[in-house]
Amino acid sequence: MSQFSHYNEDGLPKMVDISSKSATSRTATAECRVRISPRLYEAIHEQSLKKGNPLPVAQVAGIMAAKKTAEWIPMCHPILIQGTDLSFKYEPVKDGYMLVIGATVTVDGNTGVEMEALTAVTAAALTFYDMCKAVDKSMVIEETLLVKKTGGKNGDFYHPRREKMD
């Protein structure tokens, strides 16, 4: 028998059977940061980007990606997501601004939604980059992380680098 949960007795990949797990309310919140130049920040706020406002498009991309996570990540189970919400805020940093993208995904199910939240913020960041690259190709997508998760057999998790959120 394989010592790894995602490999069968022949050593080949398999999807774990979650049918015996209890359905519970679960949430996951992820975050991704995109470092941008002052020039790009100004262009966004002056609404002078040729492609238009990047945030609504990034928001839709994040929601769509959360729903398609099982198609992107081989061992993720397709799940019926109850909700996905994204947030965007700019923070001033040395030499520019940081766009902080957050995503919270909820489900009542027998597996968690951590990967869905992480996929949502990643897709939103990539879409933001695509919408803005004509002005600033030096953007840096950085620090993608799971901020918190609630529910499930293993209980709640709060990333040690973030304050505990209620």
Curated annotation (Swiss-Prot):
Alphabetical keyword list? Lyase, Molybdenum cofactor biosynthesis
Q: Which residues bind substrate?
A: 75-77, 115-116
Q: Which EC numbers characterise this protein's activity in its record?
A: 4.6.1.17
Choose any GO biological process term that the UniProt entry carries and state it: Mo-molybdopterin cofactor biosynthetic process
Q: Does the keyword Lyase apply?
A: yes
Report the active site residues.
130
Reactions performed catalytically = (8S)-3',8-cyclo-7,8-dihydroguanosine 5'-triphosphate = cyclic pyranopterin phosphate + diphosphate
Kindly report, in one word, the top-level EC class recorded for this enzyme: lyase
Q: To which pathway does this protein belong?
A: Cofactor biosynthesis; molybdopterin biosynthesis
Which is one GO molecular function term here? cyclic pyranopterin monophosphate synthase activity
Q: Which Pfam families would you find in this protein's record?
A: MoaC (PF01967)
Stated role: Catalyzes the conversion of (8S)-3',8-cyclo-7,8-dihydroguanosine 5'-triphosphate to cyclic pyranopterin monophosphate (cPMP).
| HAMAP family in the record | MoaC_B (MF_01224_B)
Question: Family, per the entry?
Answer: Belongs to the MoaC family.
Q: How does it assemble?
A: Homohexamer; trimer of dimers.
Q: What is this protein called?
A: Cyclic pyranopterin monophosphate synthase
